[in-house]
């Protein structure tokens, strides 16, 4: 049974997104970029092996999630910074939803964790469904269905 009616899987936006973002480390790179990381060494600092980081950054750039910007420090060779594109920044709600889900269903007993907050007041915020009229819709009223592609 295929409740969404999508054949083949390549037509499903979830499957297509996971082809890129489901690779180990990809969303962690985006998380670090949202937090301000731009340089290879910044991303490498979270424990990603260099060869894997190179592949993931290339995939994210090729997909339009990140862009390379050349820079050169005095006396150094030219290198690239990596910055989120608008498509990359549009992943913030995805990361925020994962923060909420992971905090709720995979809690850690102690230490530090992540929380979604506003940039100015650091007030806690939550991911929500909002209709075109701006009304917040309860999750039990939301489903995923097939519609004609745009």
Spell out what each predicted region is.
Residues 1-2, 65-72, 90, 94:
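Short, contiguous, well-ordered secondary-structure segments
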Residues 38-43, 57, 87, 91-95, ...:
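Extended, folded domain segments that form the structural surfaces/walls around functional sites
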Residues 12-52:
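N-terminal helix-turn-helix DNA-binding core of bacterial DNA-binding proteins
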Residues 22, 73-95:
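Basic, amphipathic "hinge/linker" alpha-helix immediately C-terminal to the N-terminal HTH DNA-binding motif
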Residues 44-69:
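Canonical helix-turn-helix DNA-binding module
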Residues 96, 100-150:
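C-terminal regulatory/oligomerization modules of transcriptional regulators
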Residues 1-11, 23-24:
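Recognition helices and adjacent regulatory flanks at domain boundaries
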């Amino acid at each position: 049974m295929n409740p969404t009616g999508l054949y083949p899987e390549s037509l499903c936006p979830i499957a297509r997104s996971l082809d890129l973002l489901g690779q180990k480390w990809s969303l962690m790179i985006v998380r670090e970029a949202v937090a301000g990381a731009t340089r290879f060494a910044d991303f490498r600092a979270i424990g990603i092996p260099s060869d894997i980081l190179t592949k993931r950054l290339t995939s994210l750039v090729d997909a339009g999630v990140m862009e390379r910007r050349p820079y050169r420090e005095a006396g150094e060779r030219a290198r690239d910074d990596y910055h989120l594109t608008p498509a990359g920044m549009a992943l913030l709600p995805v990361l925020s939803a994962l923060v909420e889900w992971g905090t709720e269903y995979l809690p850690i007993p102690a230490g530090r964790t992540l929380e979604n907050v506003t940039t100015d007041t650091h007030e806690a915020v939550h991911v929500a469904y909002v209709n075109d009229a701006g009304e917040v819709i309860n999750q039990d009223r939301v489903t995923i269905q097939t519609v004609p592609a745009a």
